[in-house]
Curated annotation (Swiss-Prot):
This is NADH-ubiquinone oxidoreductase chain 4L. The lineage of its organism: Eukaryota, Metazoa, Chordata, Craniata, Vertebrata. Keywords: Disease variant, Electron transport, Leber hereditary optic neuropathy, Membrane, Mitochondrion, Mitochondrion inner membrane, NAD, Primary mitochondrial disease, Respiratory chain, Translocase, Transmembrane, Transmembrane helix, Transport, Ubiquinone. It is found in: Mitochondrion inner membrane. The gene is MT-ND4L. InterPro entries: NADH_UbQ_OxRdtase_chain4L/K (IPR001133), NUOK/Mnh_C1-like (IPR039428). It comes from Homo sapiens. It is a multi-pass membrane protein.
Length: 98
């Protein structure tokens, strides 16, 4: 396995570990999720460039579109939660609390 792939897998693993460790705040969870999506996007782009397939060129673009949609929904949720509660804790997202 080349060194660039190991670095990208390490970036994904660090982002996943950050998502597991810092899951109390929504902003840190969103940043870790963006890091995971960025590393997956770079990995998909490198795989597409190495296979020289024209049909696989749409995969990184579709991942980028989904990452942008995820970021927009996450930021809208962050603004909504912070305006309602004044904090960005993830436990405020539970709708079953009284």
């Amino acid at each position: 396995m080349p060194l660039i792939y190991m670095n990208i897998m390490l970036a994904f693993t660090i982002s996943l570990l950050g998502m597991l460790v810092y899951r109390s705040h929504l902003m840190s969870s969103l940043l870790c999720l963006e890091g995971m999506m960025l590393s997956l996007f770079i990995m998909a782009t490198l795989m597409t460039l190495n296979t020289h397939s024209l049909l696989a060129n749409i995969v990184p673009i579709a991942m980028l579109v989904f990452a942008a949609c995820e970021a927009a929904v996450g930021l809208a949720l962050l603004v909504s939660i912070s305006n309602t509660y004044g904090l960005d804790y993830v436990h405020n997202l539970n709708l079953l609390q009284c």
